[in-house]
């Protein structure tokens, strides 16, 4: 219990408990308004659902027609034209979950407007936790508790939901919202209007759960009050369960008005064991209810007092009517027969919100008006649906920062940002989260579950957001636009990263060397240089990499996949960066310029490498011999000298090489290809370096100079070999006798002494 109490702070707990208790009390105008505002199932949605759920089999129409009608009803309810498959599935699961909840819990959970089944589960769990914590307190405060339950306190902690289930056999009367006359007078107009809607919503909720076996009289009264008048005129309807009875005549009202009409209040009482009574020709109608709160029974069923004047009697009734309801119906007292036509000229149907509705609605007419914003509607269900938008206004405020939320569950999740509370822990790795939804997403890493599938390419994703982002690759949608340069992006994160190009912001700092980066991913990649961590391993050759992108690129060597194709020449490449580099050969674009010497490059990486020739920076160091390099690829190539790795193998002769470029050059020996041609003499070469060296014979250029003796060379390799004279370095050692040499050619000649091979002239 101590562990569970840490999961939720006292503020969240008190808010949920207060709401739970106030919802159960159902007393006072505040509770009535909350009951109405938090009603989830509106009449129009429930009507579509009930039409589908309760569709009877038409014997005369036949099975094919029945199936067609059933399909049409289902489409009206689920609306697949605006809902995805996942949303429809979530709707069905949420509906069934709310259905199986105990009555009081279901009412409270619905009042929180859960948008998903996961959110509904969280609400039930949080409520369960609070009620379990409240149970021991209530038991200690109670002084007149009978004999202690032999099951102990644990009986409530584990069985309170079951106790509610045992009380599930409720009637429409059990969910009625009753208020007193004093409460009614204290309510604001908007509260009174919303109070009326709760009857219809409660009724449809009961029907959806299969708990209502007949349609109470008050339902058609509220849905179509002009039909009630018609029912009064034409006689009782078995469908409404009305019962016509003789009633003791009330004082003759004809004296009260020249037009022989009188007023009847169709009581907005929410007790549903109603009986509609009639006194006969020219008589008065009244609705009897089992009196709860206030009702017409307390107004109209009084004995006639002959000592009171008729006008006084009428004034009493009239005042009571206006106190208790906004629904006043006048109808002609001259009922010569049951089929007499209602006198529209004299009749008025005065409803504060809905205007005149006793007659047929004309085209373009909108008789139903919202008292909150004044918007008008043609249909009553549309008004109910609209009023729910006011009901869903944010009402839960964070005491720390003042932010408001529509759902209390959202407030609870938000407050954990302030407290740092992370109650949801992964049993696999121990990682904790502030929200259950985040834990669910995280657990898919362990299970490998990817429930969201792209309909275009079939690719699966673990998160819906990832699927949405992926689908933009098919649609080409780029909704995020840079205000500086107009460039658009498919991801908001890409836009944020791009904007740092304009601002120069580099918020991510390496704690080891102080280097800054514009993107967090670049910092993470950089930090692996310090740690030497390489968590990504190739299953083919067991080579390890520091980044997942490097592993993906490497795996294309084994698969031979070349998924990036040039639209100009059709050439395919294994890496997107290689394609981008290649495309510059068509455009000739060199947008990256060195600020020191003005040299231009087609790639930013080439510019970065070039800068190091000015700065002398060599950040890549060999851990074996300590030699440093300006480029990571040079370090990788150098390390193969120590480990002897030669991953690039010729498919024709089987010869292996440390570098892919060397293999490419070698394969030209088999093909005879010499792609590099001298423009001066027409001589062709296999290697570009050979062409560069050859061209210096025409130009006389000797760009490589020794710092010791100022001697010039046309080739870098010649300079390196020369510098070993000054340093005395002999890097080439014979593995048999250990003798060292300054040049590799000298080592090769020496090794023939051991092998007996003769040099070929």
UniProtKB/Swiss-Prot annotation:
Belongs to the krueppel C2H2-type zinc-finger protein family. The gene is ZNF287. Pfam families: KRAB (PF01352), SCAN (PF02023), zf-C2H2 (PF00096). A zinc finger (C2H2-type) spans 368-390, 396-418, 424-446, 452-474, 480-502, 508-530, 536-558, 564-586, 592-614, 620-642, 648-670, 676-698, 704-726, 732-754. Keywords: DNA-binding, Metal-binding, Nucleus, Repeat, Transcription, Transcription regulation, Zinc, Zinc-finger. Residues 49-131 form the SCAN box domain. One of its GO terms (biological process) is regulation of transcription by RNA polymerase II. May be involved in transcriptional regulation. GO terms for cellular component: nucleus. Gene3D superfamilies: 6.10.140.140, Classic Zinc Finger (3.30.160.60), DNA breaking-rejoining enzymes (1.10.4020.10). It comes from the Eukaryota. Residues 170-238 form the KRAB domain. Its main location: nucleus. One of its GO terms (molecular function) is RNA polymerase II cis-regulatory region sequence-specific DNA binding. It comes from Homo sapiens. Residues 134-154 are annotated as: Disordered. It is found in: Nucleus. This is Zinc finger protein 287.
